[in-house]
Design a protein with these regions (language model features):
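Alpha-helical transmembrane segments of multi-pass small-molecule/ion transporters
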Residues: 1-311
């Protein structure tokens, strides 16, 4: 196993250990449903917005505006492609109302924040992280607009007519807008404010993973298996989406570094924030938990294989 592959594998193991801690806390009755919901709201309203804005203010160097805009647009193309594929697949699977939104979320949104950044660093070095941060901006915006719509419409058992503007006007969305404006204006490397936000944002990853593990503690082992729709969604997240993006984006992206980072970020397992959104909107939490568990486990193999195939 080479250094890059070992670094990727190590990040996956770290993720599982934290999820396992949350699982153990639930089994030991150290966490409750009220705790899970409260911690989820804290992450979505406070620590995640702090992490997003802090990622820009802590940067010592930003690419030029042209590069920022180009990288941002490439990432938007990737997400537009994944959203279109998810809509088609859930229609072909005849996913029922009340569940189709969660399946769409699982197909489109990967765990970019926790796994994506360390994996990118392990493969291309820390200098590549600024591009990963730029690619993460569309993720944060779309995850809490389109992704929130997917899950909220599931919970309400209706279409988009039941989802109001408040679904999209959240602290996370506002922080994404602030981060994009700061990056375009070239405002960065603000030590005091950046450090404060970074310290607060550092709570996001362990807190989110503890919620995932605690929620898994509500499921019996036999309930983790899932059905055919779940497995199709997992395969789409780990295999179909990165391969499709590799083929399509290679037609418009000339820089192999940018292309590689884009493809690898689309190969991450299901985003753990899906669990918190389901908690917030009282949606189908068990399905997204199963998807998070299985895609994280299987990504121990799929991500290293993808990196090797891409060369």
């Amino acid at each position: 196993m080479n250094t890059d592959t070992l670094g990727i594998f190590t990040q996956m193991v770290v993720l599982f250990l934290i999820i396992g801690t949350g699982y153990g806390c639930k089994k030991a009755h150290l966490t409750t449903a009220a705790f899970d919901k409260g911690l989820s709201n804290l992450v979505l309203s406070v620590t995640l917005p702090a992490m997003i804005v802090g990622s820009v203010l802590n940067s010592t160097q930003l690419p030029g505006r042209t590069d920022i805009v180009a990288a941002f647009l490439y990432s938007c193309v990737a997400y537009a492609l994944m959203i279109a594929v998810a809509l088609v697949l859930t229609a072909l699977m005849r996913a029922p109302i009340g569940r189709r939104g969660v399946l769409r979320f699982m197909m489109v949104f990967g765990n970019v924040g926790f796994l994506g950044f360390p994996v990118i660093s392990a493969i291309w070095g820390s200098d590549a992280l600024i591009y990963a941060a730029i690619f993460n901006l569309p993720f944060n915006f779309l995850c809490f607009t389109v992704g929130a719509w997917f899950i909220a419409s599931d919970a309400q058992g209706q279409g988009m007519e039941k989802v109001t503007w408040r679904t999209f006007c959240t602290p996370t969305i506002l922080s994404c807008c602030v981060a994009i404006v700061l990056a375009l204006l070239g405002i960065h490397n603000v030590p005091v404010i950046g450090s404060a936000l970074d310290t607060l944002g550092a709570m996001t990853t362990p807190a989110a993973l503890l919620v995932v593990g605690s929620q898994l503690g509500n499921l019996a082992p036999r309930e983790l298996v899932g059905d055919a729709r779940l497995w199709v969604s997992c395969a789409a997240r780990l295999v179909l989406m990165p391969l499709l993006n590799w083929v399509v984006l290679s037609l418009i992206v000339d820089d192999p570094l940018i292309l590689g980072i884009l493809v690898v970020t689309t190969a991450m397992p299901v985003a753990n924030v899906g669990t918190m959104l389901c908690q917030k909107y009282d949606a189908d939490t068990p399905t997204v938990l199963r998807g998070t568990f299985w895609t994280t486990l299987l990504s121990l193999v799929t991500i290293p294989v993808l990196v090797l195939v891409m060369g």
